[in-house]
Amino acid sequence: MGARASVLTGGKLDRWEKIYLRPGGKKKYMMKHLVWASRELERFACNPSLMETTEGCKQLLQQLEPALKTGSEGLRSLFNTIVVLWCVHQGIPVKDTKEALDQLQEAQQKGKQEVAAATADGTSTVSRNFPIVANAQGQMVHQPISPRTLNAWVKVVEEKAFSPEVIPMFMALSEGATPQDLNTMLNTVGGHQAAMQMLKEVINEEAAEWDRLHPVHAGPVPPGQMREPRGSDIAGTTSTIQEQVGWMTSNPPIPVGDIYKRWIILGLNKIVKMYCPVSILDIKQGPKESFRDYVDRFYKTLRAEQATQEVKNWMTDTLLVQNANPDCKSILRALGPGATLEGDEPAFQGVGGPSHKARVLAEAMSQAQHSNDAKRQFKGPKRIVKCFNCGKEGHIARNCKAPRRKGCWKCGQEGHQMRNCTNERQANFLGKLWPSSKGRPGNFLQKRPEPTAPPIESFGFREEEPAQKEEVKSEETENKLYPQLTSLKSLFGNDPLSQ
C-alpha cells in the first residue's frame, strides 16, 4: 500500500484531504481513495504511475472520458477522482468534486479556442485525433497504432474473456483509429476464434446494410473528389490507408473509423451476451450477501444487457430493490426513490455483519421454538409407560425397584433374556405359551367340543398320523396339569358372580 499511497506527499496531500466528495457533504477525500483509484486503473489495463504527474492525469482523463457514456458508476467515480487529482497537481483550489469538474471543462474550452485560433492563423502544429497527425509540412498522415496499445488490448481480452468491461476498454484504446488500426487490434486476438467469427458475421451484415442505404451514384467520379466509401471500404478490406485518411479529413468528413468501430461494438455486445448468459432477472441477493457485492453483480450483469439506457435505468430503479433480500429491501424502501448509491452505502454497513447475523440467528431460533411449541400442543394423549418386571405403570423395567424377575420376560424360560429370545410365542400370566399350538390361551377351556359328524371309517389300512399322536399326548398332559373346569369356582374360590 505504501507505493500506491505515494502519489501525493506534503502540501499536495494536505490539499487533497480538504476537498469534499460532494457539495455540502461531510466526507472528504482520503488516502484510501488514491489506493482504490490505482487498483481500478490496473483493472482497466492503465498505468497507475501516471497519477503522479499532471500530464499523466491528463492522459488518463483522455482515455477514460470517451467511455463515460456507457460506463458504470465505478468508472465515473474513477474519472472524478482523477479530475480532483489533476486539480491538486495543477494547484487549482477547489472545494469539492463538482468544482473540479467545472475547472476541467473550462480548461478544455480554453484548449479548443487556442487550437482554433492557431489554425486560423495558419501556424498550427497541434495534431488532431490520434492516430491521424500532422507532419512538418502540415499534411495529415497516419501514425500506426503503438505496440503498447495492442499489448494492453490483448491483455484485457485474455484476462476478461469478453466480460462487459471489455467494450469501454476497446473504445478507449481505439479512439480516433482508422479501419486498418481496428483490424490490427482484432487480428491480434489469438484465442476466442468462435467469438471472432461471430464478430465477422455482424460486420458483414452491417456492411450489407450500409450498401443498401447508400447506393453508388451513376457516372464517373468528378476529378478532385474522392469516391464514396462502400461497406467493404469502411471495414478496411477494399480501401487503402490513404483513402481512409482522406475520408476522415475531407470536408465534410466521412468518419469511416467511427462507423466501423460502431459495427465492432455491436458485435462485441453480442459476444458479451454469449459469454455472460445470466439474465438480470436472475440476479438476487443472498440472505448473507453484503449489499456491496450484490450491487457489483447487478451492475456487471446489467452492462451485458442488450437494452437502451432508459430501459437500464428502469431496471436499476425496479429490480435492484425487488431482488434484494428482505433486510436490504426494507432499508431501500425507507430511503425512498431519490436516494443515491453513495448515500445508501453507509445504511447497509451492518447488514451481513456479525451483529446482524446474530440477530437473524436469534429470530430463526425463536421461530423454530414457537413452531415446536405449537406442534406439542396438537399432539395426542401421552403414551403410558408400563414396566415389564412388575407390571405397574409409570416407569420402565430399567428403573424398577421391585426384585428382578428371573427368566425371559417373553417366553418365561430361564437361561436367556428377552432381547435374545428366539421363541415367537409369549407366556401369559398363567405361564402358558401364547399363542399356543391350538390357538387358544391357557385360561380358556382346552378341550374343544366334539364334532357331530360321524368319524371317518378306518379299515385298518392307514396308520395313525404322528401329528395326531402328538396332539393326543399334549391333551393328556394338559388334562393332568389342569383338570377339566366346568366353572371358574374351582379356580377363584367362592366367586359371588358364579353363584
From Swiss-Prot:
Site (Cleavage) location in chain: 130-131, 361-362, 428-429, 444-445
Residues lipid-modified (N-myristoyl glycine): 2
InterPro entries (alphabetical): Gag_p24_C, Gag_p6, Lentvrl_matrix_N, Matrix_HIV/RSV_N, Primate_lentivir_Gag_pol-like, Retrov_capsid_C, Retrov_capsid_N, Retrovr_matrix
Biased composition (Basic and acidic residues): 460-479
Zn-finger (CCHC-type) residues: 385-402, 406-423
GO molecular function: RNA binding; structural molecule activity; zinc ion binding
Highest taxon of the lineage: Viruses
Chain location of the short sequence motif Nuclear export signal per the record: 16-22
Role of this protein: Matrix protein p17 targets Gag and Gag-Pol polyproteins to the plasma membrane via a multipartite membrane binding signal, that includes its myristoylated N-terminus. Also mediates nuclear localization of the preintegration complex. Implicated in the release from host cell mediated by Vpu. Capsid protein p24 forms the conical core of the virus that encapsulates the genomic RNA-nucleocapsid complex.
Identification of the protein by name: Gag polyprotein
Organism the protein comes from: Simian immunodeficiency virus (isolate MB66)
Gene from which this protein is expressed: gag
